[in-house]
Amino acid sequence: MRLLTSRATRVPSPSGLLCAVLAMLLLTPSGPLASASPIEAAEAAVVRELRCMCLTTTPGIHPKMISDLQVIPAGPQCSKAEVIATLKNGKEVCLDPKAPLIKKIVQKMLDSGKKKN
């Protein structure tokens, strides 16, 4: 004896429905959308990822090329300190925090910040 006729539709089982929902969630992008407003994009840039920002470092750069310097101490996101310089042309470059020239540049920027306050 057959319970389903050929015209009857089958309802997916709960496990099949669960798999479909999980697949949809995995395929949905989790990052900010390209249509985000500039303010939302700036807020998203403030949030740091939980990994090292610098994969490669540059041992030296002329200090006059640097417009801004960011020092990120070692922490749970990365086991080493990172120095990121924003150049006057807008590029960001990772600098080697152990290089003597970079240590001097960081110290000079820290000293100039203390004099302004």
Curated annotation (Swiss-Prot):
<feature type="disulfide bond">
    <location>
        <begin position="52"/>
        <end position="78"/>
    </location>
</feature>
<keyword id="KW-0964">Secreted</keyword>
<dbReference type="InterPro" id="IPR001811">
    <property type="entry name" value="Chemokine_IL8-like_dom"/>
</dbReference>
<dbReference type="InterPro" id="IPR018048">
    <property type="entry name" value="Chemokine_CXC_CS"/>
</dbReference>
<dbReference type="GO" id="GO:0045236">
    <property type="term" value="F:CXCR chemokine receptor binding"/>
</dbReference>
<dbReference type="GO" id="GO:0005615">
    <property type="term" value="C:extracellular space"/>
</dbReference>
<dbReference type="GO" id="GO:0006954">
    <property type="term" value="P:inflammatory response"/>
</dbReference>
<dbReference type="GO" id="GO:0071222">
    <property type="term" value="P:cellular response to lipopolysaccharide"/>
</dbReference>
<dbReference type="InterPro" id="IPR039809">
    <property type="entry name" value="Chemokine_b/g/d"/>
</dbReference>
<feature type="disulfide bond">
    <location>
        <begin position="54"/>
        <end position="94"/>
    </location>
</feature>
<dbReference type="InterPro" id="IPR001089">
    <property type="entry name" value="Chemokine_CXC"/>
</dbReference>
<dbReference type="GO" id="GO:0030593">
    <property type="term" value="P:neutrophil chemotaxis"/>
</dbReference>
<keyword id="KW-0395">Inflammatory response</keyword>
<dbReference type="GO" id="GO:0042119">
    <property type="term" value="P:neutrophil activation"/>
</dbReference>
<comment type="function">
    <text>Has chemotactic activity for porcine, and in a lesser extent, for human neutrophils.</text>
</comment>
<dbReference type="InterPro" id="IPR033899">
    <property type="entry name" value="CXC_Chemokine_domain"/>
</dbReference>
<dbReference type="GO" id="GO:0008009">
    <property type="term" value="F:chemokine activity"/>
</dbReference>
<dbReference type="GO" id="GO:0061844">
    <property type="term" value="P:antimicrobial humoral immune response mediated by antimicrobial peptide"/>
</dbReference>
<dbReference type="Pfam" id="PF00048">
    <property type="entry name" value="IL8"/>
</dbReference>
<protein>
    <recommendedName>
        <fullName>Alveolar macrophage chemotactic factor 2</fullName>
    </recommendedName>
</protein>
<keyword id="KW-0732">Signal</keyword>
<comment type="similarity">
    <text>Belongs to the intercrine alpha (chemokine CxC) family.</text>
</comment>
<keyword id="KW-0202">Cytokine</keyword>
<keyword id="KW-1015">Disulfide bond</keyword>
<dbReference type="InterPro" id="IPR036048">
    <property type="entry name" value="Interleukin_8-like_sf"/>
</dbReference>
<keyword id="KW-0145">Chemotaxis</keyword>
<feature type="signal peptide">
    <location>
        <begin position="1"/>
        <end position="36"/>
    </location>
</feature>
